[in-house]
Amino acid sequence: MKLLYSNILPLGTNENQQTITDCFEEQLSKADRVEIAVGYVSRASLDELNSLVDKYNIRNICLNIGMYYIEGMPEASYHTALKLNKKWIADGIGEVRMIRSFKYHGKIFCFYKNGEPFSAILGSANLGVLKMEASNRRQYELSALTTDISECIEISDHILKLKMPNCSANIGDISDMPLIFEKNTALSGIELVTEVPPSNVEFY
């Protein structure tokens, strides 16, 4: 097991330590398939994952998202995940699944080559660790990398169980996804800009 860190002062990484983000990309560069199960995602991290999948020519990927079906999903993240799901299906490489049976709060990333898992990252980091934003820039995460084959197989088996129909479904097949509508504050406080009341929005 190798510990992986966030690089946030005053607890910055030293020359012998590796960040979670750098390790993820390093393992992805060696893989042809990746299986991911996390609690939360962000729009920026979904875009970053898509870029990395293209960069390293990943042939098979499944992203399982665990908390939103019960808690509700931010609208922007939902539409980004839906778009990514459509792209991966069209490219024939994978899908985005939502865990529906319970709130899943695990965070695991399993990497494969030629059909066999060779490494896995597990710990506190959700997908958002791939792309720092204002909301998580000061959020310290700690994870670990394992290359123990028996542990990797156990983690792989766990993710495959999450993908079963009794636990999850493809995001595109879910018609009752609860969404959280986010307020756009980009024009708040700007002179001559008036906010339209919700009742007027519904009318139009």
Descriptions of predicted regions:
Residues M1-Y204:
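PLD/PLD-like phosphodiesterase catalytic module centered on the HKD motif
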